[in-house]
Design a protein with these regions (language model features):
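Short, intrinsically disordered, mixed-charge
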Residues: 19-26, 130, 146-150
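Hydrophobic ligand-binding cavity/cleft-lining segments
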Residues: 1-44, 159-161
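Short, surface-exposed coil-to-beta transition loops
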Residues: 3-5, 62-67, 89-94
């Protein structure tokens, strides 16, 4: 089983960051990993028990993960686990923890865990997939940070006048 953790400081309060991350209508405004993201099974907003489908960019295999929110506690914590069985993933789960750190900033910690398939190739696939997923997650969180840096009124952001 592979594990990883990536942390980024965002120039916004945890409530704002949490809301943007789980707004599927706006997800592709900042998420560099995905080519599509939507709530599924009639869900109209992220919540405990809601399902979502996120499909990676083609250069990463274009794999679609269908997940269910197992925890949804705004603005602190959200966690999902994989429901489908796409190529190369036997299991997959992730959490996003948000913490206000003062001066209008927050810390986002993304933790993931997965098993690769086929089982006979886990010893090769998990280290490789883990490195790629950690790098892509770091890239995603940096893009999220830049998204908040560009908003009016942010330090280094667009001026309001």
């Amino acid at each position: 089983m592979a594990h990883g953790k990536v942390t980024e400081t965002i120039p916004a309060r945890s409530g704002e960051v949490f809301a943007l991350i789980h707004d599927y209508d706006r997800r592709l405004e900042w998420d560099t990993l995905l080519r599509s993201a939507y709530l599924d099974d009639g869900n109209t907003e992220a919540a405990r028990g809601a399902t979502a489908v996120c499909t990676g960019k083609w250069y990463l295999g274009g794999i679609a993960l269908k997940t269910v929110y197992v925890t949804f506690d705004p603005p602190k914590l959200a966690a999902v686990k994989m429901l489908n069985k796409p190529p190369f993933f036997g299991s997959w789960a992730a959490s996003l923890r948000h913490e206000d750190i003062g001066e209008g900033r927050s810390r986002v910690t993304y933790t993931f865990t997965f098993t690769a398939k086929p089982r006979s190739l886990r010893f090769v696939l998990e280290p490789l997939m883990g490195v790629v997923f950690e790098l892509e997650t770091r890239k995603r969180l940096r893009a999220l940070k830049r998204r908040f840096e560009r908003r009016p009124g942010s330090p280094g952001g667009v001026s309001a006048g």
